[in-house]
Amino acid sequence: MLLLPLVAWGCTKPVPESPVDPPVVDTIKYYEQCLFRPGDYGSTNWRIPAICCLPDGSLLIVCDRRKYNESDLPEDIDIVSRRSTDNGRTWSEPVTIAQGTGRKHGFGDAALVVCENGDVVCVFVGGNGLFASSESDPISSYVCRSTDSGQTWSTPENISAQLWGSQATNTVCRNYRASFFGSGNGLRLTRGEHAGRIMFAAAMCRKGNSNTLDNFVVFSDDNGHTWQVSDRAYSGGDEAKLMELTDGRVLISVRQSGARGYNHSADGGKTWGTQGRWESMKTNACNGDILRLAATDRGDSRDILLHSIPNSMERRNVSIFVSYDEGDTWQDPVLLFDGPSVYSSMTLLKNGSVGVFLEENPNGACELWYQNWPVDSLIRQ
């Protein structure tokens, strides 16, 4: 197996450091680095960040290489990945996970999860655009996996028939003509009878002329080899993220304009309760991410969840909100980027810091930045 050399990709912005002791390897400080900007690697644009920390401590990112413009599918888009083995200070050259070959033959909107056996599962979509999709000319759902910490990837497998359309095992999903995944992080359950289950939030488009989206959870109990679909988790939804709570319930956080949407499942994501809105988190209709920082049932002194999302009714000022009550309320947003900024993804590093992969848009086109945050910079109480 060929190991790719690690390289530092420069466009790091200067960050003031405290003029104290000389650097110590284990000291966690804030730092940031631009990983993709317009024109890099021959691509006009880059979008749609996802990041995860792997069992060996390495970091894996994936994103869209939007070769000719910034538009979504059905444009010609590749999905690429990079790795870091030094907590995000240097990164490998990009590896192509799914290669687009022309309009209606591209791929995009990837999400990641690490399975119990260490495999990395990546789901994404390809083909037609979401709202133009039909069973005869669809946007398709794909899965591929890496068994070597993201260095190589399997050939993408089309799993659309398991999820929606006339062949779907969930008969409700036969009433839908398209589906896509909320890019960023999926979820692996670690508590209760469904421990080991992996899942992603999907937004499905109803048949007919309606562009209304509903959220379902796509889950697997065999590390992503076969898939099932939950009951409807959120009506009138969009891109969404999932989190396991300390009492074993699953929380879904749903993109909305204004107060962000949510719901809960008490049976491992299969059925869902009554949807609601978080008045404590009002934001632009945008994708974000949710991350567990601490859990009392694992020995921590309190429960802490983080949620990244624009702290604005516009796509700007992406921030991290904090919850100390398992997502009932959100507070104390910490600004990640002061200015136009859009999608974001988070992960917890082995050294205890928080890694963020973020779309910053200071000059009219997205740059994809990695930020490393000490936990004490994010928690204010």
What name fits each language-model region?
Residues 1-4:
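Sec-dependent signal peptide recognition
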Residues 8-10:
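C-terminal motif of bacterial Sec signal peptides marking the signal peptidase cleavage site
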Residues 12-14:
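Bacterial signal peptide processing site
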Residues 17-381:
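Asp-box/BNR beta-propeller blade signature and adjacent active/binding-site loops
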